[in-house]
């Protein structure tokens, strides 16, 4: 599974979803789904904008964690 660390980054920088939305132009709903890890897909442009905004690499924002049951897909 893919784990998104957007919520952690917000906390570390003491930012709100609305701050990031305003500063990047990314839709608030998109950011909310990233925050609660309910996104079913990740758009490359959104990830690019977030990495630029936070000054981080993609591995800081997303992490692959192997499923415990070994299921794929």
Language-model segments: residues:
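A short, Lys/Arg-rich alpha-helix, primarily the initiator
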Residues: 1-18, 23
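Phosphate-coordinating loops and pocket residues in cytosolic domains that bind phosphorylated ligands
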Residues: 22, 36, 63
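Recognition helix of helix-turn-helix/homeodomain-like DNA-binding domains
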Residues: 26-41
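Short, charged recognition helix plus adjacent turn
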Residues: 33, 62-73
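Short, solvent-exposed alpha-helical "recognition" segments
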Residues: 38-43, 70-72
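DNA major-groove recognition helix of helix-turn-helix/homeodomain DNA-binding modules
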Residues: 45-60
């Amino acid at each position: 599974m893919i784990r998104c660390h957007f919520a952690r980054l917000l906390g570390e920088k003491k930012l709100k979803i609305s701050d990031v939305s305003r500063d990047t132009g990314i839709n608030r709903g998109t950011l909310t789904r990233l925050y609660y890890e309910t996104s079913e897909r990740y758009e490359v442009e959104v990830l690019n904008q977030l990495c630029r905004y936070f000054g981080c690499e993609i591995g800081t924002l997303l992490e692959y964690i192997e499923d415990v049951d070994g299921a794929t897909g």
